């Protein structure tokens, strides 16, 4: 993938860029793997906003991705196409298995049309193959990693993501995550070899607010710019600083909100470099 820059023909295009989509081999998705994806505008069943800054955007259909890859062990598959997926930053690969079934997977870097891949404990160590962690050599770069055996991939799924298998210790495998955290994961969990493709995606300059609206992202408004009815920092004559310590729209103090002493904390060998202090 490469980044194509626009000429500054308008203020919105000045400095903006777009992916060149050179790796895409088909523009229409596989119909049998499409599902409806209705929009909710960040609202729950009561109509209340539960996730802010969501709304509008282009209509999408969900592509069913095989995150488990545990029911086709030993069955060879051919990469039929590399496709665009509007629901994620990574590209997806359409696999044609020799038994006639079709599946989508996250497309790893350097995977191309016509490649042969497979799953299972005896699979080769090459990009796109899926194996249990206990069967992967130490030092291998992996992605699409399960947290529970058979639970489906949860980590390392976005564009350019890569996790390194640094050690194996009894029933656990130690992984170094992109954040710098080192974490134990059950060695029976599966992972895919290689790093996720489309790594240049993070370098795209969207150029104007309208392109984010096409993606379904609404503006983020500062609390001090609101009215008192809308935010604890709202109101005041002229420009004010809010008059209190930073809080959320619901009065929660600024800072980390994750509960400490979670059961999964014992699996963390070394924490990532924290940007904000715990409160």
UniProtKB/Swiss-Prot annotation:
InterPro entries reported in the protein's UniProt record: NA-bd_OB-fold, Rib_uL2_dom2, Ribosomal_uL2, Ribosomal_uL2_bac/org-type, Ribosomal_uL2_C, Ribosomal_uL2_CS, Ribosomal_uL2_dom3, Ribosomal_uL2_RNA-bd_dom
Single GO MF descriptor: transferase activity
Gene Ontology terms describing biological process: cytoplasmic translation
Gene3D superfamilies linked: 2.30.30.30, Nucleic acid-binding proteins, Ribosomal protein L2, domain 3
Biased composition (Basic residues): 269-279
Keywords recorded for this protein, A-Z: Ribonucleoprotein, Ribosomal protein, RNA-binding, rRNA-binding
Domain of life: Bacteria
Signal peptide stretch: none
Similarity comment: Belongs to the universal ribosomal protein uL2 family.
Job of this protein: One of the primary rRNA binding proteins. Required for association of the 30S and 50S subunits to form the 70S ribosome, for tRNA binding and peptide bond formation. It has been suggested to have peptidyltransferase activity; this is somewhat controversial. Makes several contacts with the 16S rRNA in the 70S ribosome.
NCBIfam families, sorted: rplB_bact
Official protein name in the record: Large ribosomal subunit protein uL2
